[in-house]
């Protein structure tokens, strides 16, 4: 299964929806089956500190538009 998530708030908001999104993704990662993937769609790279709060896994991938910038 492939799950897409609008991750704009995850990489830009420290509290509120950003915190909720990071907690949601971090809660889903341990439940993923071998072939499952989480695709986190965001229009920019956002804040590295906030991106790093998401569990690093081969099954989690950020997806940016071709013209994405900091």
PLM features: residue spans?
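Carbohydrate transferase catalytic cores enriched for Leloir-type hexosyltransferases
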Residues: 1-70
